[in-house]
Amino acid sequence: MTTRPILGVITTSVPSQNDPRSRASYTPKAVWCQLAKAAVEQGLTLCLFRPEDLLPTKGAVVGYVSVGGTWTRTQTPLPDIVYENVYVHLATKPDVRAARRFFRDRGTPLFNPRLGNKHELAEWIRQDRALWQHHPETELLVEAQQVFQMLERYERVYLKPLHGSSGQGILEIAPYHQQRFSVRAAKFSNTKQPLDVAMTRTELVRLIRRECKRRPFLLQQGVELIHIDKGKVDLRTHLQRNRRGKWEQVALVVKRGRPNSIVSNYHAGGSRHDWKWLEEAVRGERTRLPKLDEVFDLSERIARSYTEKAPRLAALGLDLGLDRQGKLWLLDVNARPGRNILDADQVARCAELHAEFAAYLLER
């Protein structure tokens, strides 16, 4: 086994011990192959292992290591640094928590932590007055009456699941007519089907109470974002930390939702574009776009703020809304941003930066 420091990745995306693929020739996803190459360039060896494959009594893990491009499942010494890459919905499982606790107790650096739920993320930004002015009014939903109180101040409001992602479960509520309310969703509740109905106040209260029994929600001001061809538009900035521990802009993606959808998510049928496309699309309209430097500056300020909360934070995906006056709004924060909207070069750079940041942490 190589004497290079080991960059371990806790992940559930590789085959388990009982999976036939673990005994046959196995090649992980391209991003892991890219990370293995980048790790070598930083003087590290990459080992992909499942949380249950940690062997504390033996001081080892059983994982997948690439040697000359061939991946084999083998026992290695304990990693010198660990990148946590377990899916968010699995991050609190007992074996994942046990592995995380073991490495922390041992003093092994772990990076790419969970930042918290949407309420915790909002409360952190609330402490910074300059950043909070870019955040929609937000509060934890405790009772249905809060919805009607916020609707007295804004044309529409959104109910967002505290632990939601990909637009799942978000409700848009707005006054309709004759004391009724428009209620819409791209992926509603457990059905994950679109919803577009008008409800009386009593019906809406009943719906809110029922949904809140299933899971906690955040109540948020609706921002009047720009639309192009009836599709809601927002921005995704993807940032990662480099060899010096500094934040680097990897990508700026313009997202446009399906016509009349309440979300712009790629997973919900949206499309991806570049900044030049957006400039062309709004030309001749009464819409002011911020300068690119403004977008990048705000993104980096937000990233630096969350670094104070989590010093080993490695990556951030920020969803920024744009209103017609050119103001930027922080709509969502992803500490483990998906790469499906990035191009091949950007995905490769993500892998390089993870290896760079691991090397940076090992030197501290």
What are these regions, as identified by a protein language model?
Residues 47-51, 218-222, 234-235, 309-325:
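A short glycine-rich, hydrophobically flanked beta-strand micro-motif that places a catalytic Asp/Glu
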